[in-house]
Amino acid sequence: MWAYAIKAKKVIATDVSSLHELQKLEKDADWLWIDCFEPNPEEFQLVSELLCIDEKILDDMKMGRAFPRYKKHNDCTLLSISVATIQNELKTYPIYIGVKERLVMTTRKPGSSKPVERTIQTVKDCVEEMEKANPTFVVCEVLRETSNENLEVMMALREVIETVEEEAIARPSRKALTKKVFALKREIAVLYRLLWSEEQMMSSLKDGLIPNLEPCEASVLGLKDAMDNISRELEFLNSYDNALDGILRLQDLGMIHRVEKTLIYLTIVIVAMNLILIAMEIGILDLLLGL
């Protein structure tokens, strides 16, 4: 567990392991950022004691459960943010942020580390120039970096959809293709909900509707830009979903074409059989007349 104490526009990084150390750092610093990477049970207990959160919320954090809006417990505000990744399939990983007076705490997993690590670097690089570097700035930057990370998933998703479209044109009748299409539609639905939830959280933060958080003008502008990007990507997700619907319609047309071909073959066979039967009947009549 690392603590970043900000005092006199300097960042002092310290590895801490006890509540006493954290309380001392908090007392001496202008404000304090505590970052937990894959917290163990002891560190979760420290989080609970420092933020004064109840067991239910702590259990949600341990299990990696996301909550769609902020939670307020005593004088602590808790936020849940999800980071999406896509390799063989879409996966989401949580970041939890707790804010209390001059303290901000983040907990994360390997899959959700990049936004926090980038924000840590931003604070280190810019703390001397920033007039209003505070816990709210950290929350805004983590949100902005998370949205950037999630938007990168869109590019990977688009590439997968293009590959499926090429397969559909080449071999529209493949049953495996239908499974891929429905799997992609599920992933699009998950990503849509995730981005929409982020946009709503940014909007609430921008408008000052989340307790303990008061973004400065620069942070508000950053949030607006991120929200504009998310709105644009949500439109793209709708177009991706429509493209997948087009693939399903193409498969339906292919199935109809196959049925039509089968009916044509059956009709030819039936006509041929009828001709044979007629020929056989004529042959029998000729034999009877000859007799």
Give short role names for the model-derived ranges.
Residues 217-242, 258, 285:
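Charged, long alpha-helical assembly modules
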Residues 234-269:
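Membrane-interface, cytosolic juxtamembrane amphipathic helix immediately N-terminal to a transmembrane helix
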Residues 1-210, 225, 229-239, 265-268, ...:
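Peripheral, non-transmembrane regulatory/ligand-interaction domains of membrane transport proteins
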Residues 204-225, 242-248:
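Hydrophobic alpha-helical transmembrane segments
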Residues 257-291:
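Bilayer-spanning, highly hydrophobic alpha-helical transmembrane segments
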